[in-house]
Each structure stands twice: as structure tokens, then as C-alpha cells.
From Swiss-Prot:
Subunit structure: Part of the 30S ribosomal subunit. Contacts proteins S2, S5 and S12.
Name of the gene encoding the protein in the UniProt record: rpsH
Cited Pfam families: Ribosomal_S8 (PF00410)
GO MF: rRNA binding; structural constituent of ribosome
Cited function: One of the primary rRNA binding proteins, it binds directly to 16S rRNA where it helps nucleate assembly of the platform of the 30S subunit central domain. The combined cluster of proteins S8, S12 and S17 appears to hold together the shoulder and platform of the 30S subunit.
Keywords: Ribonucleoprotein, Ribosomal protein, RNA-binding, rRNA-binding
Superkingdom: Bacteria
Database matches in PROSITE patterns: RIBOSOMAL_S8
Protein name: Small ribosomal subunit protein uS8
Family designation: Belongs to the universal ribosomal protein uS8 family.
Keyword rRNA-binding: yes
Gene3D superfamilies for this protein: 3.30.1370.30, 3.30.1490.10
GO cellular component entries: ribonucleoprotein complex; ribosome
Keyword hit for rRNA-binding: yes
Length: 138
């Protein structure tokens, strides 16, 4: 039994990028789809689509990589360098608008679940709302 499906999704994405997979499948939910929508809009993934695998709904996440590097390691640059769950089932983390962290001085994003929906840190600051700090990505 999974106790934290969001952490499972982030781990699947992290593991797939480390071995340069083109895509990975995660069990579908509306909340996960909202997180993936933000990751796609911010340029961390190519996109995603709903698929059925053995009659069960999944989200197929298409991962994104940068150009191939020069030198002895010709693998492409990873777009997602770090993806980490912050608020967990055992320790929820809520922040007000003034406590929303700036991830890597604005180069990364924090994803929050707010009363206005699932938002990035910049959107939440702009709207003046706080919420549950789901994860950070850079």
C-alpha cells in the first residue's frame, strides 16, 4: 500500500531522468495531473498524457533533456537536477505568503496546494495566498 502517491510520482520521475528514459508511467489522479501541468508549463518536462495500462488509468510523463554535452561524457544535460517532496503525510508543511521559499534564488520552483488551486511559488506570491508546500524542483 502506498502511503504517499505524490512522493511515488516524484521518485519515478527522478529515477527515470537519472537513467535517461524517454517517458515514465505513474498512476493517475487529478492532483498529480495538476502538478504535471505545472512542470510542463515551467519547462521541466515535455508533457504528459492520460493512458490506460491493463485497464487502469495512468499518466505517461515525457521527460525533457538538454543538448548533448561535449567531452568524455556525451549524455545530454538533465533538465530536472533536483525534485524533492517537502510536505509529507507524517509532517505537513504549510506556509503563509511571506514564508514561501525562493528556490535557487528564483531559478527553481516550489509547488503549493492553495485555496486557489495548485500554483507555483511565484503565482502564489502574486495572488497573495499561502498553502501546503508540496515539492521543490530545479
Amino acid at each position: 500500500m502506498l502511503t504517499d502517491p505524490i512522493a511515488d510520482m516524484l521518485t519515478r520521475i527522478r529515477n527515470a531522468t537519472r537513467v535517461y528514459k524517454e517517458s515514465t508511467d505513474v498512476p493517475a489522479s487529478r492532483f498529480k495531473e495538476e502538478i504535471l501541468r505545472i512542470l510542463a508549463r515551467e519547462g521541466f518536462i515535455k508533457g504528459y498524457e492520460r493512458v490506460d495500462v491493463d485497464g487502469k488509468p495512468y499518466l505517461r510523463v515525457y521527460l525533457k533533456y538538454g543538448p548533448r554535452r561535449q567531452g568524455p561524457d556525451p549524455r545530454p544535460e538533465q533538465v530536472i537536477h533536483h525534485i524533492r517532496r517537502i510536505s509529507k503525510p507524517g509532517r505537513r508543511v504549510y506556509v503563509g505568503v511571506k514564508e514561501i521559499p525562493r528556490v535557487r534564488r528564483g531559478l527553481g520552483i516550489a509547488i503549493l496546494s492553495t485555496s486557489k488551486g495548485v500554483l507555483t511559488d511565484r503565482e502564489a506570491r502574486k495572488l497573495g495566498v499561502g498553502g501546503e508546500l508540496i515539492c521543490e524542483v530545479w
